[in-house]
């Protein structure tokens, strides 16, 4: 039976096996179970002896891969993978995955961290960033057979290594430092056309605003190569060692992996976890008070900026030695406000991915949400009312200045329509806060 060995940095963790019937099983290595660095690969795959055969095995590894069937088909075509199943795809592109996971054939070992790369010229960088237009997945251009990465999510993206001011393609098992996101483009729906051609600018703006309001988000910058404009987001699952000679992978997983769920149920409306389940889970965090506070604060932020994609795969935890965990920075934040009007969507169509408590059922429609719904949710969750009031009051006080500060920090060629659309609607919803909490 074919096997893939799972590594965390240079530590052998266990073996992923694909059975004859297509099922996936996982077994922790004895030396990993005995190691002082031992931690579960996933909180849905607790440390234990023997084979783990639950659905959580398939779902954990499947969630390391891009969501899009189109991108998966490109991987099959590019590397002649046997199928679209996780084992077969990760056999080809599992060298640098989300978190600390590296998957290698049985005959390959990692005795020490290796750092090797190829510096990219601007022309080569543009080639990597436009590879998807030629049906090449994740920027893995044909001339670079050694460049094999897996980046989860639905958006066109790749990952690259930043050395000083240079963008580089990593060689072998060398990690990447940044996720590189391309413009999403147009999404055609039955009743609307969503123009996300400015998604790079949109996400950059949202990350700046989140940081200005005290939320923990990764650093990001807009990069250009030829005619390509992309967003480079610093990976929080990577860290240089003290000497800055070796890049370490940090174990983490998203909430679908944590709960052993497939990505098909990442939305609460499809049966995935909502605020209550995640808040209950964060009670067990090594920084429970902070994480629960920050998570509730982020729910308010998503409402204010019209972020409709806050599903389970867009929240993650770091997995620490022994299996303790804590919340990672927030990520993948885009406002839907620039999509309003024209052939786009109406404000009444915008809904949060996770519902808030209301007098009757759940409230998801962004334009129908008021501060009272956050307070009602906090009450159901037994989240301290005084802290929820504090969060709402802080946003009421901070929003106007934060918007001004972000606007003055933007590059001169930043699209004004993105700023106007987000700012106008944020201030409109902010009015609901300021009426109750005051704002000067």
Regions found by a protein language model. Give the residues of each.
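Phosphate/dinucleotide-binding and metal-coordinating scaffold of catalytic cores
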Residues: 1-312, 316-440
């Amino acid at each position: 039976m074919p096997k893939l060995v799972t590594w965390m940095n240079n530590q052998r963790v266990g073996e992923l096996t694909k059975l004859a019937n297509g099922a996936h099983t996982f077994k922790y290595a004895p030396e990993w179970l005995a190691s002082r660095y031992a931690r579960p690969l996933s909180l849905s795959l607790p440390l234990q002896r023997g084979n783990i055969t639950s659905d959580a095995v398939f779902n954990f590894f499947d969630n390391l891969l891009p969501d899009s069937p189109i991108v998966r088909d490109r991987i099959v075509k590019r590397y002649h993978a046997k199928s679209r199943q996780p084992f077969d795809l990760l056999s080809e592109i599992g060298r640098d995955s989300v978190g600390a996971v590296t998957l290698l054939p049985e005959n390959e070992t990692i005795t020490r961290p290796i750092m090797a790369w190829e510096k990219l010229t601007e022309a080569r960088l543009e080639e990597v960033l436009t590879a998807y237009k030629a049906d090449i997945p994740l920027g893995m251009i044909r001339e670079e057979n050694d460049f094999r990465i897996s980046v989860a999510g639905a958006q066109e993206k790749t990952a690259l290594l930043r050395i000083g001011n240079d963008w580089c393609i990593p060689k072998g098992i060398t990690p990447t430092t940044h996720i590189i996101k391309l413009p999403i483009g147009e999404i055609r729906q039955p009743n609307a056309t969503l123009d996300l051609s400015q998604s790079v600018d949109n996400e950059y703006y949202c990350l700046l605003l989140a940081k200005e309001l005290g939320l923990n988000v990764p650093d990001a910058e807009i990069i250009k190569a030829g005619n390509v404009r992309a967003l480079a987001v610093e990976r929080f699952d990577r860290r240089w060692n003290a000497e800055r000679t070796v890049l370490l992978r940090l174990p983490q997983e998203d909430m679908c992996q944590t709960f052993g769920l497939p990505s098909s149920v990442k939305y609460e409306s499809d049966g995935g976890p909502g605020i209550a389940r995640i808040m209950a889970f964060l009670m067990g965090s090594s920084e429970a008070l902070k994480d629960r506070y920050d998570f509730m604060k982020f729910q308010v932020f998503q409402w204010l900026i019209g972020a409709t994609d806050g599903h389970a795969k867009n929240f993650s935890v770091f997995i620490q030695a022994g299996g303790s965990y804590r919340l990672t920075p927030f990520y993948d934040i885009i406002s839907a406000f620039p999509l309003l009007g024209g052939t786009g969507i109406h404000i009444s169509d915008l809904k949060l991915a996770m519902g808030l408590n209301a007098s009757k059922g759940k409230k998801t429609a962004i334009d129908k949400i008021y501060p009272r719904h956050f307070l009602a949710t906090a009450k159901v969750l037994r989240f301290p009312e005084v802290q929820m009031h504090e969060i709402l009051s802080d946003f009421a006080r901070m929003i106007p200045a934060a918007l001004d500060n972000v606007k003055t920090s933007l590059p001169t060629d930043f699209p004004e329509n993105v700023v106007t659309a987000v700012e106008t609607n944020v201030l409109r919803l902010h009015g609901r806060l300021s009426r109750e909490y005051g704002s000067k």
